[in-house]
Amino acid sequence: MEAPDYEVLSVREQLFHERIRECIISTLLFATLYILCHIFLTRFKKPAEFTTVDDEDATVNKIALELCTFTLAIALGAVLLLPFSIISNEVLLSLPRNYYIQWLNGSLIHGLWNLVFLFSNLSLIFLMPFAYFFTESEGFAGSRRGVLGRVYETVVMLMLLTLLVLGMVWVASAILDNNKASRESLYDFWEYYLPYLYSCISFLGVLLLLVCTPLGLARMFSVTGKLLVKPRLLEDLEEQLYCSAFEEAAPTRRICNPTSCWLPLDMELLHRQVLALQTQRVLLEKRRKASAWQRNLGYPLAMLCLLVLTGLSVLIVAIHILELLIDEAAMPRGMQDASLGQVSFSRLGSFGAVIQVALIFYLMVSSVVGFYSSPLFRSLRPRWHDTAMTQIIGNCVCLLVLSSALPVFSRTLGLTRFDLLGDFGRFNWLGNFYIVFLYNAAFAGLTTLCLVKTFTAAVRAELIRAFGLDRLPLPVSGFPPRASRKTQHQ
């Protein structure tokens, strides 16, 4: 064999090994996410649905749970996609010739983007509708009962739904797109209609993020306040615990010995009072066990961090609005070749990349908080060991829509300059200046409005509680104080 043949063979072997390595890394990453999501979903599922007398229903619920786990793993992968790409680029810039990070390259990142796009389409269009119809199916009339009969009914329903959605997408593309070829190429499902459908879903997800994120940014302050110990400057914890124990003992004694009172007792009301007093006592004990640093510095530092992150995100969006008016390069666009390790995507280098990653995670958490805080989706909020299977399916679909729109959301707002890879950059509406500009302006305006309305009221209330002014007998506006009433009677 000649020398050129050896060179060709070595190149082919290298490409083969790189491909196998990328497959192994992708499989390990997905397996890790799948295990984490399975553990997470088992904490919220309703155990009665999986331990029923009917083995058929339990089998159906187990299959639906595995499909939900797969979808949630893809959603978590979509959340980690953009931060992982930004960090990988900075690592390759810092250590360009390190032997131990040769597996980290542009081909791997580009492949992960394509896999997330593919499996997001698969989950939204096929797996989640299949899981819902599968749990609701009972088999065709006259057919034998069993899992196979349910599968037949589910497949038929899914085919009808696919035809309906495909027809709607074809009509929408024919109306919105003036290209005659798009109306005649109905057979071109994979190259045109599936990305077009996902583009519409992603656009709805970006609009949902526009509504939920400002609401979540405002709610993050109150949610953090419930998780941390708030400082109280003028309080005696021992006295409050002593009083709380006496208040709890009175209704408890009435419940244990109802015959001691000659008046009829409302036992349900007494139980609610005991539960409320026990909750109050647990909070007081938590405050007593907390250290002085945790009581006095933890909550203010957390509020300061939230305020800095929120203000920084609004500032970046405002700067991006000005860049849109000046430079056309600020528009979000797709990138076909993932050339990583050549230039930093932040003006501040690695420090700026860390800030970008922190802002992306912060906005994603805020959007989830805002989503479950909104009145429209509050009923979807999962409960510990008490979440129905259909509710789990709905949560997985909503989280996948939000997470798959996160890369487009972050690039549209200018939080990062990392261009969208693969099919994420093929969305037609990303090239519309008016949509991108109005989206940035709406986000900045809604976030500022929610912060001004919510944060100022929350700070005022917390300052009043911190100084103990809420326990003072202050007069209510519109009514004279008690002393003046006594003087009037005299």
Swiss-Prot record:
Ranges of the Cytoplasmic topological domain: 43-66, 136-154, 218-305, 372-388, 453-490
Assembly and binders: Dimer. Can also form higher oligomers. Interacts with LCN1; this interaction mediates the endocytosis of LCN1. Interacts with UBAC2, FAF2, VCP, AMFR, ZNRF3, CTNNB1, LRP6, GSK3A, GSK3B, FZD6, DVL2 and RNF43. Interaction with LGB and SCGB1A1 is controversial.
Family: Belongs to the LIMR family.
Keyword Zinc tagged: no
Organism: Pongo abelii
Membrane-spanning segments: 22-42, 67-87, 115-135, 155-175, 197-217, 306-326, 351-371, 389-409, 432-452
Domain of life: Eukaryota
Gene Ontology biological-process entries: hematopoietic stem cell differentiation; negative regulation of canonical Wnt signaling pathway; receptor-mediated endocytosis; T cell apoptotic process; T cell differentiation; T cell proliferation; Wnt signaling pathway
Region annotated LCN1-binding, chain positions: 1-76
Pfam families in alphabetical order: LMBR1
Subcellular location per the Swiss-Prot or TrEMBL entry: Cell membrane; Endoplasmic reticulum membrane
Keyword Glycoprotein assigned: no
Alphabetized InterPro entries for the sequence: LIMR, LMBR1-like_membr_prot
An example Gene Ontology molecular-function term: transmembrane signaling receptor activity
Extracellular compartment spans: 1-21, 88-114, 176-196, 327-350, 410-431
Coiled-coil blocks: none
Name of this protein: Protein LMBR1L
Membrane topology: Multi-pass membrane protein
Function: Plays an essential role in lymphocyte development by negatively regulating the canonical Wnt signaling pathway. In association with UBAC2 and E3 ubiquitin-protein ligase AMFR, promotes the ubiquitin-mediated degradation of CTNNB1 and Wnt receptors FZD6 and LRP6. LMBR1L stabilizes the beta-catenin destruction complex that is required for regulating CTNNB1 levels. Acts as a LCN1 receptor and can mediate its endocytosis.
The entry's keywords: Cell membrane, Endocytosis, Endoplasmic reticulum, Membrane, Receptor, Transmembrane, Transmembrane helix, Wnt signaling pathway
Region (Interaction with LGB), start-end ranges: 1-59
GO cellular component: endoplasmic reticulum membrane; plasma membrane
This protein's encoding gene: LMBR1L
